[in-house]
A protein has these predicted regions:
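Membrane-proximal basic amphipathic "stem/tether" segments
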Residues: 1-40, 47
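Active-site and donor-binding regions of nucleotide-sugar-utilizing enzymes
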Residues: 39-170
């Protein structure tokens, strides 16, 4: 059964690898020749909502630092899409633009591991093989997990910043 599940994921992994290669290459070209593809902050939560620390951080960036190139990853049919549209910089989750910005971004900020990834599960597994986005990754933890920290020490967990809610967590 486990092998069958893994085999069912193969097309998904292949699609992500192809998109990754294309967008990494195109992203490098865009960053080299188009200034608007540099200094990108990509923020998100699950990609379907804007209600947690990711939204409030994004709102802060858009209102207090409008000079930054900030984008928020969200689905068009999300009940929270209007909030992001009002702030500007909405990026449709899973779109070509999402992939391109993901691989161009200098900062990937989110409330989940593999922040802003087009496919969280696939990108988590690809990261375990050393294949990941170029941007620095920040995890805006929601809630207090203090004693549930084992998962934070996995080899494929690449975080440059872990924002926590309580002193014992760091």
């Amino acid at each position: 059964i486990l092998m069958k599940r893994k085999l069912l994921r193969v097309p998904c992994y292949l699609k992500e690898l192809l998109a990754m290669l294309l967008c990494k290459l195109l992203g490098a070209v865009c960053r080299a020749f188009i200034p608007s593809y540099r200094g990108i902050w990509l923020v998100g939560e699950r990609g379907t909502d804007a209600r947690d620390n990711g939204y409030w951080f994004y709102r802060y960036l858009r209102t207090q630092h409008p000079e930054l190139r900030t984008y928020y990853v969200i689905t068009a049919d999300s009940p929270d899409a209007a909030k992001i549209a009002a702030l500007g910089g909405a990026v449709q989750r899973g779109s070509f633009r999402h992939y391109l910005l993901y691989y161009c971004a200098d900062y990937l900020v989110g409330t989940h591991v593999q922040p802003c990834a087009p496919d969280l599960i696939v990108h988590y597994h690809l990261a375990s093989k050393g294949i990941r986005a170029r941007g620095k990754q920040a995890f805006l933890q929601h809630g207090v997990i203090m004693s549930e920290m084992q998962w934070m020490h996995r080899e494929n967990l690449y975080l440059n910043l872990f924002v926590c809610g309580a002193k014992p967590e760091y």
